Amino acid sequence: MKLKILILALIFVAGASFTILTQKEWPVPDKYNKMPNPLKGDAASLATGKELWAKHCQSCHGKSGKGDGSKAAQLKTTPEDLSTSEMQKQTDGALFYKTLEGREDMPSFKKKIPDQDDIWALVNYMRTLKK
């Protein structure tokens, strides 16, 4: 029994390490890194962000943003865990840019969410996902 637990723990650590190593750096232009969020994280903004999260993001990133959504296993790349301190350290502008532009399995939301204030509301909601 102890051997099974040890083997499972090693598999988990190896898988987590592989995921970390395979995450490519995602450079963000300075213009976006320095861009301030024009929306306050008030109740209305968070409600809009939560609704957009459920509609557009939850299937890959999961309800709590850990990258464990129902479609995550079908993707070539692992969805980011938005609850980590590393993700939460990113500027609002960086999160806005990544949502707007997308890359690889992460789609661009320029057309799906054409109102930029809605993307900013989504960024505000992402801030609530921290551990």
Locations of the language-model features?
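Electron-transfer interface patches adjacent to heme c in soluble/periplasmic c-type cytochromes
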Residues: P79-G93, F109-I119
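Periplasmic/extracellular electron-transfer cofactor-ligation site
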Residues: P29, A44, A54-T77, D105-S108, ...
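Electrostatic cytochrome c docking/interface patches
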Residues: K24-L52
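Bacterial Sec-dependent signal peptides at the C-terminal "C-region" and cleavage site
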Residues: A14-E25
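C-terminal capping alpha-helices of c-type cytochrome domains
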Residues: K98-E104, K111-K131
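Sequence context surrounding c-type heme c attachment/ligation sites in exported
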Residues: L46-Q58, A73, K89-G93, R103, ...
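Sec-dependent N-terminal signal peptides
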Residues: I5-V13
